[in-house]
């Protein structure tokens, strides 16, 4: 595959400035797709798998204008141009009948759009977040879905040709203030539009009926105990709220952060100014040391207001997140009108509920990474695992080795996606992230891979390898055979210096060491390395059945684990491989390989170790949630369905003793080889991350059908707030 950087500047400029006119995307060479600024397609367009639409979205990352007017396409599929930030203008097919859900989500440079008269349906959130869209023309009478044109802050004019208002949802144009957008309709139809659902918003704020929150329909994760007092008087929430800390002179002073979080949450939901001088409802925050778990809390709603008690500030915070969902209710509006009197007693099933993101493959800008944290907290996820290095890039500043980010923080492309990525995190940014996450009671766990998945470092320091070969940064998926050399003293010096700086940056008790996919065949490059052979002889490794290389990896790991555990007081973590015959005391292993979870759990029990459950069939969120869902890649992917994630049993059927003595937590992984924008990370994560949160939190979780009912309110709230998620469930 040709790389963009190998093309001359003249070729880039000439190719980019010329419009590409073809029947379909297969008529364009990869470099033409990567550099096309203008596209015109005239043939029959495919919509499934590695389709014409997938290629336009993912491979034509510089394209600004697209003309599909003469294309043979009746369906614009779901997510067709999802978060394609460079797109400024598109002419839709003349024969188009449907526009899928989130088809133009967050196309924030799109400035105008005309919906042809042939279109019969516009899906939910189809144009949500197109903040530069100023002109919208609808020529026919399509049915318009929920939040289809929501959050269009730049919209100035909407023109319609139909005298009969197209059927719309009350939320279709959410965010438009009455009188702020010029609505041009056929003469004589003004009154019809003023009365029509969805369209009346252009003239006056829509009236939505009063709602009393029903916690049985809106809470995720579901609390362990929820008792709603039927018949008791409900509390009107649209009044003054007074936030009170029960023990200001003692333990209560540690709740300053939770007070600020409560104030922000009430302001966002209710809009009222919290004023302690006015009579109103009380929100009492308190510490209850009698609760068993550090994250446990109780929440009581009575005639005076809300009382939240936690074993620690973490418990109080999770109680606030539960209150936020109660105030959200059905999600039809920012806040319900009233809440019932109730009692909640809650505690987590697992101590760690983690998401892993992968900025090594696709860099996540720092502000976008920060923004991911509050959304996690809404569902009581409490750890964010950062996969900071891999074969494709090195993303964390190491002051001892500035060359790592100077030379290895640029990724030329990945497989058929020839989109360049660059960027890294400074140490100050990571400290800021840690402090920010702490406000949401989320732990930041860094990962540095070893001995495999280290090509980015090897490209800078070839002396880290057995044969000291300089290799380029990897631009494909898969496994590299270039590994760190355990027989080389510089390997230990390098890793020691890197982990020294990481230990200073990240206060977490945990550091992840990688350990997976070290070559294919595994560790093979150590077999003929003179330094590795000398080390084997020195430490008494005599086997020749390839187990000797795993023993050598154990030697390397033992040294780094001892350093982390004894010098920096960190608990090492690593991805479990079935050839690990010994798990060092105190370590946490990750059961990740699809179909091999049973072996990983047995090894944890045998070694009296703790284990994080993240098997691919339940927890790989980079996989599509359903067949045909993003990411549609050219080589195909397995499916991890929402139901599969929800069905995860953290104990894996091994009973209470395993859960108590060996289970560490549950984790969802977001490997980013095929995730091209920050918005796509949310899309791949949710709603599966919510299902994972409930699997990890709720001891006796309800049925999957019950979860889907409760998910409806969450989905509406996410659309209202402009958060993307997969709707393929």
Regions flagged by a language model, labelled:
Residues 37-47, 62-75, 85-98, 108-121, ...:
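Structural signature of tandem-repeat unit edges
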Residues 209-351, 572-576, 713-729:
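Acidic, contiguous N-terminal accessory segments
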Residues 1-21, 210:
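Bacterial Sec-dependent N-terminal signal peptides
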Residues 20-30, 214-222:
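Boundary/junction segments of secreted and surface-exposed precursor proteins
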Residues 572-578, 582-729:
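Flexible, acidic glycine-rich loops studded with aromatic residues
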Residues 291-510, 526, 559, 667-672:
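Feature activates predominantly on carbohydrate-active enzymes
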Residues 457, 462, 473-587, 594-597, ...:
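Active-site neighborhood of glycoside hydrolase catalytic domains
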Residues 79-80, 100-103, 123-128, 146-148, ...:
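Consensus positions within tandem repeat domains that build extended binding/scaffold surfaces
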């Amino acid at each position: 595959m040709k790389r963009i950087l190998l093309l001359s500047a003249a070729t880039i400029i000439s190719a980019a400035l010329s419009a590409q006119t073809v029947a379909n995307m297969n008529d364009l060479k990869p470099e033409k797709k990567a550099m096309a600024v203008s596209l015109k397609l005239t043939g029959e367009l495919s919509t499934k798998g590695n389709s014409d639409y997938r290629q336009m979205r993912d491979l034509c990352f510089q394209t600004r204008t697209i003309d599909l007017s003469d294309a043979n396409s009746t369906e614009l599929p779901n997510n067709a141009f999802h978060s394609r930030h460079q797109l400024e203008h598109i002419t839709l097919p003349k024969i188009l009948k449907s526009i899928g859900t989130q088809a133009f989500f967050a196309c924030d440079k799109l400035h105008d759009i005309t919906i042809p008269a042939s279109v019969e349906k516009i899906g939910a959130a189809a144009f949500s977040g197109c903040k530069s869209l100023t002109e919208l023309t609808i020529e026919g009478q399509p049915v318009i879905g929920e939040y289809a044109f929501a959050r269009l802050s730049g919209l100035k004019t909407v023109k319609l040709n139909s005298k009969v208002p197209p059927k719309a949802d009350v939320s279709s144009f959410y965010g438009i203030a009455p009188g702020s957008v010029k609505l041009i309709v056929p003469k004589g139809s003004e009154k019809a539009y003023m009365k029509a659902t969805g369209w009346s918003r252009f003239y006056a704020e829509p009236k939505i009926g009063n709602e009393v929150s029903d916690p049985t329909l809106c809470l995720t994760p579901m609390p362990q105990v929820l008792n709603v007092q039927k018949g008791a008087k409900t509390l009107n929430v649209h009044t003054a709220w007074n936030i009170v800390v029960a023990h200001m002179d003692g333990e209560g002073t540690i709740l300053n952060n939770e007070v600020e979080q409560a104030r922000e949450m009430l302001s966002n939901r209710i809009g009222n100014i919290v004023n302690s001088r006015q009579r109103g409802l009380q929100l009492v925050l308190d510490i209850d040391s009698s609760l068993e778990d550090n994250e446990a809390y109780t929440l009581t709603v009575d005639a005076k207001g809300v009382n939240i008690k936690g074993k620690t500030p973490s418990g109080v915070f999770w109680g606030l997140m539960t209150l936020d969902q109660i105030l959200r209710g059905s999600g039809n509006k920012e806040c319900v009108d009233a809440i019932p009197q109730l009692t909640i007693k809650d505690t987590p099933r697992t101590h760690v509920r983690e998401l892993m993101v992968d900025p090594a493959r696709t860099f996540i800008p720092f502000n976008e990474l920060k923004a991911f944290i509050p959304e996690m907290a809404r569902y009581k996820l409490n750890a964010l695992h950062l996969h900071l290095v891999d074969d494709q890039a090195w993303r964390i500043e190491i002051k001892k080795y500035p060359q790592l980010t100077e030379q290895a923080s640029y990724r030329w492309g990945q497989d058929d996606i020839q989109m360049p990525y660059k960027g890294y995190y400074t140490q100050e940014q990571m400290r800021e992230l840690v402090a920010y996450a702490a406000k949401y009671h989320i732990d930041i766990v860094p990962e540095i891979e070893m001995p495999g998945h280290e090509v980015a470092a090897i490209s800078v320091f070839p002396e880290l390898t057995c044969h000291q070969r300089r290799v380029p940064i990897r631009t494909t998926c898969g496994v590299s055979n270039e590994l760190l050399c355990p027989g080389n003293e510089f390997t230990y010096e390098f890793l020691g210096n890197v982990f020294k700086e990481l230990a200073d940056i990240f206060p977490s008790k945990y550091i992840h060491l990688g350990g997976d996919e070290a070559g294919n065949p595994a560790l093979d490059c150590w077999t003929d390395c003179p330094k590795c052979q000398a080390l084997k002889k020195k430490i008494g490794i005599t086997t020749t059945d390839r187990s000797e290389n795993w023993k050598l990896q154990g030697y390397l790991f033992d040294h780094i684990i001892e350093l982390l555990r004894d010098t920096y007081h960190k608990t090492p973590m690593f991805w479990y491989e079935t050839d690990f015959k010994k798990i060092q005391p105190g370590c946490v292993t990750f059961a990740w390989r699809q179909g091999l979870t049973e072996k990983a759990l047995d090894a944890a029990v045998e070694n009296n170790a703790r284990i994080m459950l993240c098997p691919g069939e339940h927890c790989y969120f980079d996989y599509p949630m359903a067949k045909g869902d993003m990411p549609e890649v050219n080589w195909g992917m397995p499916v991890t369905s929402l139901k599969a994630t929800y069905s995860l049993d953290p104990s894996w059927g091994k009973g209470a003793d395993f859960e108590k003595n060996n289970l560490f937590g549950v984790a969802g992984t977001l490997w980013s080889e095929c995730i091209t924008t920050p918005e796509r990370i949310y899309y791949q994560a949710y709603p599966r991350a919510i299902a994972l949160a409930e699997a990890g939190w709720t001891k006796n979780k309800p049925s999957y059908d019950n979860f889907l009912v409760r998910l409806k309110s969450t989905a509406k709230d996410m659309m209202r707030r402009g958060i993307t998620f997969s709707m393929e469930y």
